[in-house]
Regions:
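Cleavable N-terminal export/targeting peptides
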Residues: 1-33
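Short glycine/proline- and aromatic-enriched beta-strand/turn motifs that initiate or cap beta-hairpins
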Residues: 24-98, 270, 276-278
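Residues on the lipid-exposed face of transmembrane beta-strands in outer-membrane beta-barrel proteins
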Residues: 38-40, 79-83, 134-138, 152-156, ...
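Extracellular/periplasm-exposed beta-strand and loop segments of Gram-negative cell-envelope proteins
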Residues: 46-74, 97-130, 156-184, 212-221, ...
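Transmembrane beta-barrel architecture of outer membranes
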Residues: 76, 184-190, 202, 223-231, ...
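Repeated loop/turn-to-beta-strand initiation elements of outer-membrane beta-barrel proteins
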Residues: 88-91, 144-146, 199-203, 239-242
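A charged, solvent-exposed segment within the mature domains of Sec-exported extracytoplasmic proteins
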Residues: 133-200
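Transmembrane beta-strand segments that form the barrel wall of outer-membrane beta-barrel proteins
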Residues: 203-215
Length: 279
């Protein structure tokens, strides 16, 4: 898996070198047409969820990290691209995948969907969360020192939970496996700012929030999204730089669908280090 990721990253960097080699002008702060970022993200997590069942009723609220032993921290590759459509309008795309797993013997009876796992059951769990934020923003303040923008976008979220247990007391299923899936674009209103300390160094911050109710893929999702971050970048050449960031994100959602009926609360926080390219 990591081999494929790094191969794709190398291909992306090769394309960037080709584009930059044909660029006609040195990019100026706030005037770049494209900015690419690729690096490592090291978040820590706090996740609770509940999966109901039509026959068994309301499921138990479960902490994935504390009760199911799913990894509390993970290192993943994170990439993004910014396209400046015009002087004040820009689009941004971010993508990363969080894939965690764990095995633990539970110390209380837990109902997850159509499964009831008794005390002493050994549960092996896998939780995947893919996040693809797509956002448009407009710079209402823009000069040689500052760029302050606001806009809106979609936080495309794909969530998958799979739990396999060594014992089950469910009266309606002999399967030991419990699953839940959710897939929906969630709206987000965002604002960001960037301050150019000098031509080679800048600092920035961003916030986002929304209270939503959306229907997609045979399900209804409603809840809240909150996000915040801070970053700094240093351009060691006209086209290439390094950066660091800190990101915080929270989503609380109630899901009513054919593949998941229940609740989901998810928080991550962590640093990011990346390489940047611009033209």
């Amino acid at each position: 898996m990591q081999t494929h990721v790094w191969r794709n990253a190398f291909l992306l960097l090769s394309v960037l070198f080709t584009l930059l080699s044909t660029a006609q002008a040195v990019p100026i702060n706030g005037e770049e047409q494209f900015i690419f970022k690729l690096g490592y993200f090291l978040p820590s997590f706090d996740t609770t969820l509940r999966v109901n069942n039509e026959q068994l009723g309301r499921g138990d609220e479960v902490s994935l990290e504390n009760e199911l032993g799913i990894d509390r921290e993970e290192t993943t590759i994170r990439g993004s691209v910014m396209w400046r459509i015009s002087e004040r309008n820009k689009l941004s795309l971010d993508i990363f995948n969080l894939n965690r797993s764990g095995t633990k013997t539970i110390n209380r009876q837990i109902q997850i969907g159509d499964q009831i796992y008794p005390v002493g059951a050994s549960l092996t769990s896998k939780f995947t969360f893919t996040i693809i934020p797509i956002a448009w923003s407009y710079a209402f303040i823009k000069n040689s020192d500052w760029e302050v923008s606001a806009g809106a976008g979609l936080q495309w979220s794909v969530i998958n939970l799979k739990i396999d247990g060594s014992a089950s007391l469910s009266p309606i299923s002999t399967s030991r496996e419990a699953t839940a899936d959710a897939n929906a674009p969630l709206p987000l209103i965002n604002a960001d700012m960037k301050y150019y300390i000098n031509p080679d160094w800048n600092v920035g911050a961003n916030i986002g929030a929304f209270t939503y109710k959306v229907g997609a893929a045979n399900m209804t999702m409603q809840g809240d999204i909150l996000s915040a971050g801070a970053s700094t970048e240093w351009w060691f050449t006209d086209y290439f730089g390094v950066g660091g960031a800190v990101n915080w994100f929270y989503i609380g959602v109630t899901v009513d669908g054919s593949k998941w009926d229940g609740e989901f609360n998810y928080t991550y926080f962590g640093p990011q280090a990346y390489l940047s390219a611009r033209f």
